[in-house]
Amino acid sequence: MRGIFVSLVATLGLVAAAMAGTTGMAGMAAAAKPADAGDWAMNATIIEACSCPMFCQCYFNAGPSGHEGHEGHAGGHFCKFNNAYRVNHGHYGAVKLDGAKFWGSGDLGGDFSTGKMDWIVVTFDKSVTPEQRDAIGKIMGAVYPVEWGSFKTAEGTMEWTAGKDTAWAKLDGGKTAEVKLHRPETAANGAGDVVIKNLKYWGTPRNTGFVLMPNEIEAYHAGDKPFEYKGTNGFMITFDITSKDVPPAAPAKAS
């Protein structure tokens, strides 16, 4: 998947508002939104996997690879993904984001040349406060400037662990979603990780490289569009973005 969220806009406002929405989030409904902040920043690491073969061609094309029907899956073109995020450090005005965890599950669809993706469910760890959720949503609108056909939010308990040779994350103990990656044993030219450098990650201006780690499993078990894949694309990446990296919005035209 070309990140989770290739152009992730067409409309930053739509994505930001959706990610900060309260669908299925009773606790967020009564929360006051943090004031708009001119200064914000996020440095986050993602455990990411999708249904595409290794390495996901969505980073170089306007559509995902074709999939023959197998293991109970229908054929066609799609990129079904799970992205598990952990914020290393960040803020949105006075709202601190260090340590916040959240998850994205969905499908980019078969053609995203216009910046329109199929569907996504964003799940926040229960420890993330309403103010943090709203702040994350606004920042992620710049990270992934796209429009979604369907956008929902949820809440769950998230585990996130990155080691030397493996990385894994679970939602609700794996009942809702799970991802497990492993470092390839035969692809490296020598000791160390296999890393793709100088490749842009969505709307972010800086990243540490795509650390390639095929998945052992990437699955989403909730809702009406569950999926599960094994042995397909996976990687870890750390991105960095600040408010200074995003150009100011164009002024509204006088009517």
What are the roles of these predicted feature ranges?
Residues 1-4:
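Positively charged n-region of N-terminal signal peptides that target proteins for export
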